[in-house]
């Protein structure tokens, strides 16, 4: 008997690297999207931490009035933020090498652009990595589709809105009070609370929270009893066990009697699809709303829409909101312009008799 031994070609270094990158046996899956995700998110995180602690004030409005955002310049965790790139820069790509010095780059808010653009690349790659791992494991792709909702929301406030408004200085500041400031100014300029897509987003987030709490509490409550009536049902289970611990038929029966029969799911797959789709679709709509308001297609305006027979305005809640919007608008960027845009746009009365 003759044995033929074939010498196996040793795999190249590149081949071993590719196998390691795409291996599903690693403790944390890397993947080709991860090759870009890891450096971009590390960069965004590192610069965020350094800038939040030590960045000097930024001339956000481009009028030589720097605004302090870092901890070392007098802020705390609540008031601190990464101040958006200066209006003097607008939408220009502003890496460090485009500035005359690092001091100039910091003064004009260069770190904001650096953080935001790396962050958006990173989270987009994280979404791609979710799809890639699902593909390698033979799973369906809906995890990445669900994650597209927060990715779209982040892209809307950090990229699409500044593009529509013409400057990164209009992007959302990276901090707690900065986020609230962004929301208040957004309401003042775009009447977002009266936009149907924002309403759908509110229904998505609040409804998703409600459905998540209902589902979790119902599953936890409808245990398959493994004990006698005289001891706690909890004694029949150990945390993380593989065996099924709840009965969907019992849960369906409970909920069907609590509300009505057809308000309850008796199919686990359709139930979980609903739990995923409701908040995702809501947040998609909100991101779409921000992206349309970026180009000044604003919320509904019912101001002074109710009048009496003499043509006198009967104030409604729309007029109250309008008055609040004007108040918020005159308070922000108070030194950048003399009047809010709504007032400045009104035609001056004729004075020639």
UniProtKB/Swiss-Prot annotation:
Record-listed chlorophyll a ChlzD1 binding positions: 118
Prosegment residue ranges: 345-353
Binding residues for Fe cation: 215, 272
Co-factor remark: The D1/D2 heterodimer binds P680, chlorophylls that are the primary electron donor of PSII, and subsequent electron acceptors. It shares a non-heme iron and each subunit binds pheophytin, quinone, additional chlorophylls, carotenoids and lipids. D1 provides most of the ligands for the Mn4-Ca-O5 cluster of the oxygen-evolving complex (OEC). There is also a Cl(-1) ion associated with D1 and D2, which is required for oxygen evolution. The PSII complex binds additional chlorophylls, carotenoids and specific lipids.
GO molecular function: chlorophyll binding; electron transporter, transferring electrons within the cyclic electron transport pathway of photosynthesis activity; iron ion binding; oxidoreductase activity, acting on diphenols and related substances as donors, oxygen as acceptor; oxygen evolving activity
Residues annotated as site: Cleavage: 344-345
PANTHER family cross-referenced by the UniProt entry: PHOTOSYSTEM II PROTEIN D1 (PTHR33149:SF55)
General remark: 2 of the reaction center chlorophylls (ChlD1 and ChlD2) are entirely coordinated by water. Herbicides such as atrazine, BNT, diuron or ioxynil bind in the Q(B) binding site and block subsequent electron transfer.
Family: Belongs to the reaction center PufL/M/PsbA/D family.
HAMAP family with a match to the protein in the record: PSII_PsbA_D1
Protein name: Photosystem II protein D1
